C-alpha cells in the first residue's frame, strides 16, 4: 500500500497539467481529481459519485460502454472505459481525464458540458492522443499511456504499465461519424431528413430545427430565415416557425432539410416562394411559367400561349395587309385583300372569294407578286386574268393563247385586229381570283402573262401586246377558267419568243405575209373562202357562236393541260429554201408537181371523183403497210404553213397564212378540239427543237408537206361538201387521238429546204384538191381530192411521216406513204418525219435523234413499227 500511495502524486501532477490545459467545466470524472474519482484517490472517490453519463459504476471500472439512452458510444467515446481505472473510461478527449461525458465526440454542448469542453475536444483531437486511461499505477496494468512512452501512471524507473493504446481519441483530421442512414444508394442523400448534411450536429440527432433550440436548423447556428431561405410557407417568421406541429403549415416537409437550400418545397403552390413553380394551388393559372416571369412581362407560359393563339388566327403582319390601308391589293383597292385595309373591307361582293382564293394560292407557295399582285393590276386587273389571262399578252388575249404569236394566233398582225377578250378585268373578280389562285397554286409566275415577260409583239404567251385577234367571242369566264386549268398543269407556252419561229413576224416566213403562200390571201388558194372572219383564234373570230368559242377555249386549255411544248419549232430559219417557190406550182389541179425530189408521181390523179372511190381509197390507205394517211400533207393539225394547228404561223387562223383543214385554219371550229386532243397525247415539250418534233426533217423532206397527193392525192377523191366538214372534224379528232406526230415541228429543216418545197405544198399537196375547197371550209364546194372523212379515217391509224419520203412504197391510188422514223438529214437523204413513231411515241432505237440524221429504222423497230398496241 505504501508503494502504491507513494506513486499517486506523480500521475496527479500530470493530471494537473492536463487540467490546466483543458479547463474542465465541472468537477468530477477525472480519477482522483475531484470527489467521485478513482477509489483511493481524494476523498469522495465513490465510483459513479458524480451523476453524469459515463460515470463509473463501481470497482474502478467505468460504465461508459453505453452512451446516453443506451446507445452504443462512438469510437473513442467511452468504449474502453471498462479497461481504465476511473469512471468514464478512456472516452476520446477523455472522460476519466477530468472531463465530463459531455466532452465526448458527439456530446458537445449537451447539458453537463462546460464552456471549455469544445476547447478540450479540439485540443485533444489536435494532440492526436487519447490520453489513455489514467489507471496505470506502477506495476499495474496501465491501459493506456502516451504512445511509445511509459504508461501515464508509471513511475519512472518502475515497471511501466502496458503501453496505452494510443490514438484512440479523435486524431487529427478524423471525421466524426454520423448516425442515421447517411448517403444512400447512388450517392444520393439519405431518406432521413438532415442526414448527410455537414455540421457538428450529426443529421437526425436533433429533431426538426432543434427541440431545445427553436429556430436552429440542422446546420448549427443557422436559424431558418436568416440568410438561408425558409423552405415552408411562413418559415423564418419566428423562433418557432417550421417546428413540427408549431409552424403555420404543419412544419417540415418530407425530404426537405430546413435551413439548407437543397430541395424545393413539396406543398402545392409556393405563394411567392423563390423555389416554386409560380402557380397558385387549385388549378388557378400561374403568374408565369418560370420563376421570375410574372404576367405582363411577355415571357413565360402565358406569353407563349398567347403568341401561339395569335399566330393561329392572325395573318402575316405588316402595314396595310391585315388590316390596314396597305398599298396594292386584290383587285387594286387601297387595302390589301381587297378593299380598304381589312379582309372584308369595302371591296366587291366577290372580295371574300378572291381573298379565299388568294389565301389558297399563297398556301401552296405562289410566287411573290402573283396573288396578291402589284397595286391593282394582277387579279383581276391587267394581270390574271386582266391583261394577262385573258387580256393583252395573256391566255387568251393579244400575244397569249390564243392571240398574236400564241396558240392559236398569227405571228404577225392578225386579220381581225386586237382580240382582247372583253377588255382587261372584265372577268368577274371571284372567277378571276379563283382561276388565278388555282393557276398560281401550281406555281405560275407572276406578271402580266403566264409567264410574264413584258409587253412585246407576239411570242410566248404573255410576251406582248402585239396586234392580233383574240378569242373571238369566247366567254371571259370560260377563257379565265380554261387559262387557269391550262396553267394548272404548267403549259410551257405554245410559241417561242416573238420572231423566233419563222412566221411570227410578218415577212420572216415565206407565206407569213398574205400572198406569199398560196391560199393565204382570200382567193389565192383555189377553193378558199375569201375573207374568213376572225384571226386564227381557237376557233377564231369567225365562229358562228360564242358557245363554240368557249368550247375551243376549253379544248385549248385541255391541250395545254398535258403540256403542249413551248415553241412550235424553236429553231429560227424554219422555212428556208423551197418555201413554196412559184406558189401552187405547175399542175396544181392535175396533181403533177415540179422540181426534183418532190415525191410527186407523174400523172398523179387529182380532180373530182366519186364517193365510193374516195371511201375505198381511204380504206386502202388505212390498211397500207406503213399506215400513212392519204393526204397527210395538209390535213394534220398544225403541220403546214397555211393549214396548221391554230396559232402557229402567220396565216389566218392557224398555222400558216391560209385557210386550213377544219381545225387548222381560221374560223374552223371543228378540229380545234381535235387539235387539243392531239396535243393531249403527248406533243413533245420542245415541238420542233433540234430533234424535237421534227428537228431536221421535221415536216418532211422533199415533198414534205404531204408529198404528192397531199389531201387529194388519192385519185377518185370526192369534193367534200358542207356535211363532210363535221365528219372531217370528228375523224380528224379521232385521227389525232392516235398520235399524229404532235403539233408539228417547225425546227430547222421542219419547214426548211424541201419542207414546203415544190411538191410539198405544190400541185396536189395544197393544190386544187389538196386543200382546195371542199376539204377545207365547211360548206365549200370541193375541187376534188379525198373527202375529209375518208382522209381522216385513213389518218386515224397514225401516219408518223408527215410528208412524202422519196422512194417509199406507195399505196394504191397514188400518193407517197410516209415511213415512220426517217429523218431529213444531210447524211441520209430522203428523210421523212423521223423522230416520232406511230402514235406520236419516240422510236425505241436511238430515240429519234439519230432518225433525224437519217438512220433508217429509227422509228421502225420493235413496238413502234406501226403495230397497234393492245
Swiss-Prot record:
Gene Ontology molecular functions: extracellular matrix binding; extracellular matrix constituent conferring elasticity
Residues modified to Allysine: 122, 126, 290, 309, 360, 363, 434, 438, 441, 485, 488, 554, 558, 615, 619, 623, 677, 680, 730, 734, 793, 796
Gene Ontology biological process terms from the UniProt entry: aorta development; aortic valve morphogenesis; blood vessel remodeling; cellular response to copper ion; cellular response to dexamethasone stimulus; cellular response to fibroblast growth factor stimulus; cellular response to hypoxia; cellular response to L-ascorbic acid
Subcellular compartments: Secreted, Extracellular space, Extracellular matrix
The organism's place on the tree of life at top rank: Eukaryota
Keywords associated with the record: Disulfide bond, Extracellular matrix, Hydroxylation, Repeat, Secreted, Signal
Modified residues (Hydroxyproline): 87, 375, 413, 418
4-hydroxyproline: residues carrying this PTM: 39, 75, 105, 207, 220, 223, 244, 338, 402, 408, 518, 539, 637, 646, 662, 670, 715, 842
PTM section of the record: Elastin is formed through the cross-linking of its soluble precursor tropoelastin. Cross-linking is initiated through the action of lysyl oxidase on exposed lysines to form allysine. Subsequent spontaneous condensation reactions with other allysine or unmodified lysine residues result in various bi-, tri-, and tetrafunctional cross-links. The most abundant cross-links in mature elastin fibers are lysinonorleucine, allysine aldol, desmosine, and isodesmosine.
Disulfide bridge partners, by residue number: 860-865
The keyword Repeat appears for this protein: yes
Stored InterPro entries: Tropoelastin
Family, per entry: Belongs to the elastin family.
Function (record text): Major structural protein of tissues such as aorta and nuchal ligament, which must expand rapidly and recover completely. Molecular determinant of the late arterial morphogenesis, stabilizing arterial structure by regulating proliferation and organization of vascular smooth muscle.
Subunit organization: The polymeric elastin chains are cross-linked together into an extensible 3D network. Forms a ternary complex with BGN and MFAP2. Interacts with MFAP2 via divalent cations (calcium > magnesium > manganese) in a dose-dependent and saturating manner. Interacts with FBLN5 and FBN1. Forms a ternary complex with FBN1 and FBLN2 or FBLN5. Interacts with MFAP4 in a Ca (2+)-dependent manner; this interaction promotes ELN self-assembly. Interacts with EFEMP2 with moderate affinity.
Descriptive protein name: Elastin
Species in which this protein is naturally found: Rattus norvegicus
Amino acid at each position: 500500500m505504501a508503494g502504491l500511495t507513494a506513486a499517486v502524486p506523480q500521475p496527479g501532477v500530470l493530471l494537473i497539467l492536463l487540467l490546466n490545459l483543458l479547463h474542465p467545466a465541472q468537477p468530477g470524472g477525472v480519477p482522483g481529481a475531484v470527489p467521485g474519482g478513482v477509489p483511493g484517490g481524494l476523498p469522495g472517490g465513490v465510483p459513479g459519485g458524480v451523476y453524469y453519463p459515463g460515470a463509473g459504476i463501481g470497482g474502478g471500472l467505468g460504465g461508459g460502454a453505453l452512451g446516453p439512452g443506451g446507445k452504443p458510444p462512438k469510437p473513442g467515446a467511452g468504449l474502453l472505459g471498462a479497461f481504465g481505472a476511473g469512471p468514464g473510461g478512456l472516452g476520446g478527449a477523455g472522460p476519466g481525464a477530468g472531463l465530463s461525458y459531455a466532452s465526448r465526440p458527439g456530446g458537445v454542448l449537451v447539458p453537463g458540458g462546460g464552456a471549455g469542453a469544445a476547447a478540450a475536444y479540439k485540443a485533444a483531437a489536435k494532440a492526436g492522443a487519447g490520453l489513455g486511461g489514467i489507471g496505470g499505477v506502477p506495476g499495474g496494468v496501465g491501459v493506456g499511456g502516451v504512445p511509445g512512452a511509459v504508461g501515464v501512471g508509471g513511475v519512472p524507473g518502475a515497471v511501466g504499465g502496458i503501453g496505452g493504446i494510443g490514438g484512440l481519441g479523435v486524431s487529427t483530421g478524423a471525421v466524426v461519424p454520423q448516425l442515421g442512414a447517411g448517403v444512400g444508394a447512388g450517392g444520393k442523400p439519405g431518406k432521413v431528413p438532415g442526414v448527410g448534411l455537414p455540421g457538428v450536429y450529426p443529421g437526425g440527432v436533433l429533431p426538426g430545427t432543434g427541440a431545445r433550440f427553436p429556430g436552429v436548423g440542422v446546420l448549427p447556428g443557422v436559424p431558418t430565415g436568416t440568410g438561408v431561405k425558409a423552405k415552408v410557407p411562413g418559415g423564418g417568421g419566428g423562433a418557432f416557425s417550421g417546428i413540427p406541429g408549431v409552424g403555420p403549415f404543419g412544419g417540415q416537409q418530407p425530404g426537405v432539410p430546413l435551413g439548407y437550400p437543397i430541395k424545393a418545397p413539396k406543398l402545392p403552390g409556393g405563394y411567392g416562394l423563390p423555389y416554386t413553380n409560380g402557380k397558385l394551388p387549385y388549378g388557378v393559372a400561374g403568374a408565369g411559367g418560370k420563376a421570375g416571369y410574372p404576367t405582363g412581362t411577355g415571357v413565360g407560359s402565358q406569353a407563349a400561349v398567347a403568341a401561339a393563339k395569335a399566330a393561329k388566327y392572325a395573318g402575316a403582319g405588316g402595314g396595310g395587309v391585315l388590316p390596314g390601308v396597305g398599298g396594292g391589293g386584290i383587285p387594286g383597292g387601297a387595302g390589301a385583300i381587297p378593299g380598304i385595309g381589312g379582309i372584308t373591307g369595302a371591296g366587291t361582293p366577290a372580295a371574300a372569294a378572291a381573298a379565299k382564293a388568294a389565301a389558297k394560292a399563297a398556301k401552296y407557295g405562289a410566287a411573290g407578286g402573283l396573288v396578291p399582285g402589284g397595286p391593282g393590276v394582277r387579279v383581276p386587273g391587267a394581270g390574271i386574268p386582266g391583261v394577262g389571262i385573258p387580256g393583252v399578252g395573256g391566255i387568251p388575249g393579244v400575244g397569249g393563247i390564243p392571240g398574236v404569236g400564241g396558240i392559236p394566233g398569227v405571228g404577225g398582225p392578225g386579220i381581225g385586229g386586237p382580240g382582247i377578250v372583253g377588255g382587261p378585268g372584265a372577268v368577274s373578280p371571284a372567277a378571276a381570283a379563283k382561276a388565278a389562285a388555282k393557276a398560281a397554286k401550281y406555281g405560275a409566275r407572276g406578271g402580266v402573262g403566264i409567264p410574264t415577260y413584258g409587253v412585246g409583239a407576239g411570242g410566248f404567251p404573255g410576251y406582248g401586246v402585239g396586234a392580233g385577234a383574240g378569242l373571238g367571242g369566247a366567254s371571259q369566264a370560260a377563257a379565265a377558267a380554261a387559262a387557269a386549268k391550262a396553267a394548272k398543269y404548267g403549259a410551257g407556252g405554245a410559241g417561242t419568243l416573238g420572231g423566233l419561229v419563222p412566221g411570227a413576224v410578218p415577212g420572216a416566213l415565206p407565206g407569213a405575209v398574205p400572198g406569199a403562200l398560196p391560199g393565204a390571201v382570200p382567193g389565192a388558194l383555189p377553193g378558199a373562202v375569201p375573207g374568213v372572219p376572225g384571226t386564227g383564234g381557237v376557233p377564231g373570230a369567225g365562229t358562228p357562236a360564242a358557245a363554240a368559242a368557249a368550247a375551243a377555249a376549253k379544248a385549248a386549255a385541255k391541250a395545254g393541260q398535258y403540256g403542249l411544248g413551248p415553241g412550235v419549232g424553236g429553231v429560227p430559219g424554219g422555212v428556208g429554201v423551197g418555201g413554196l417557190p412559184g406558189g401552187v406550182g405547175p399542175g396544181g389541179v392535175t396533181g403533177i408537181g415540179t422540181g426534183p425530189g418532190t415525191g410527186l408521181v407523174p400523172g398523179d390523179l387529182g380532180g373530182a371523183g366519186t364517193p365510193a372511190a374516195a371511201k375505198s381509197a381511204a380504206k386502202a390507205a388505212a390498211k397500207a403497210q406503213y399506215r400513212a394517211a392519204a393526204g397527210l400533207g395538209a390535213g394534220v393539225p398544225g403541220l403546214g404553213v397555211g393549214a396548221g394547228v391554230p396559232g402557229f404561223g402567220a396565216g389566218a387562223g392557224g398555222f400558216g397564212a391560209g385557210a386550213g383543214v377544219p381545225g387548222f385554219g381560221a374560223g374552223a371550229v371543228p378540229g380545234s378540239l381535235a387539235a387539243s386532243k392531239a396535243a393531249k397525247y403527248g406533243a413533245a415539250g420542245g415541238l420542233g427543237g433540234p430533234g424535237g418534233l421534227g428537228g431536221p426533217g421535221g415536216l418532211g423532206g422533199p415533198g414534205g408537206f404531204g408529198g404528192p397527193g397531199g389531201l387529194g392525192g388519192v385519185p377518185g377523191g370526192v369534193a367534200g361538201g358542207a356535211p363532210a366538214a363535221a365528219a372531217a372534224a370528228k375523224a380528224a379528232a379521232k385521227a389525232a387521238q392516235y398520235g399524229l406526230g404532235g403539233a408539228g415541228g417547225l425546227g430547222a429543216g421542219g419547214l426548211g429546204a424541201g419542207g414546203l418545197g415544190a411538191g410539198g405544198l405544190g400541185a396536189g399537196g395544197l393544190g386544187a384538191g389538196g386543200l382546195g375547197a371542199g376539204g377545207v371550209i365547211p360548206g365549200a364546194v370541193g375541187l376534188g381530192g379525198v373527202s375529209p372523212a375518208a382522209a381522216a379515217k385513213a389518218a386515224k391509224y397514225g401516219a408518223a411521216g408527215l410528208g412524202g419520203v422519196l422512194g417509199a412504197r406507195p399505196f394504191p391510188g397514188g400518193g407517197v406513204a410516209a415511213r415512220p422514223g426517217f429523218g431529213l438529214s444531210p447524211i441520209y437523204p430522203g428523210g421523212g418525219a423521223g423522230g416520232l413513231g406511230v402514235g406520236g411515241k419516240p422510236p425505241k432505237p436511238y430515240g429519234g435523234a439519230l432518225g433525224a440524221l437519217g438512220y433508217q429504222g429509227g422509228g421502225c423497230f420493235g413496238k413502234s413499227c406501226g403495230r397497234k398496241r393492245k
